[in-house]
Amino acid sequence: MPQLVPFYFLNQLTYGFLLLIILLVLFSQFLLPRILRLYISRLFISKL
């Protein structure tokens, strides 16, 4: 089980943080604005 070998801790932390940063950028730049636009448009349509 390489997860328990201390030699691999730094490698797992590095790739974990890198993946977290990439996902954060992707969500904040692409996915969340689309969801927000959809939510706002539905809100305005329901108030008509």
Curated annotation (Swiss-Prot):
Coiled coil: none
Subcellular location: Mitochondrion membrane
Regions crossing the membrane: 13-33
GO molecular function: proton-transporting ATP synthase activity, rotational mechanism
Cell wall biogenesis/degradation is among the record's keywords: no
Source taxon at top rank: Eukaryota
Chief place where the protein resides: mitochondrion
Keyword RNA-binding: no
Function field: Mitochondrial membrane ATP synthase (F(1)F(0) ATP synthase or Complex V) produces ATP from ADP in the presence of a proton gradient across the membrane which is generated by electron transport complexes of the respiratory chain. F-type ATPases consist of two structural domains, F(1) - containing the extramembraneous catalytic core and F(0) - containing the membrane proton channel, linked together by a central stalk and a peripheral stalk. During catalysis, ATP synthesis in the catalytic domain of F(1) is coupled via a rotary mechanism of the central stalk subunits to proton translocation.
Subunit composition and interactions: F-type ATPases have 2 components, CF(1) - the catalytic core - and CF(0) - the membrane proton channel.
Family per similarity comment: Belongs to the ATPase protein 8 family.
Protein name: ATP synthase protein 8
Source organism of this protein record: Wickerhamomyces canadensis
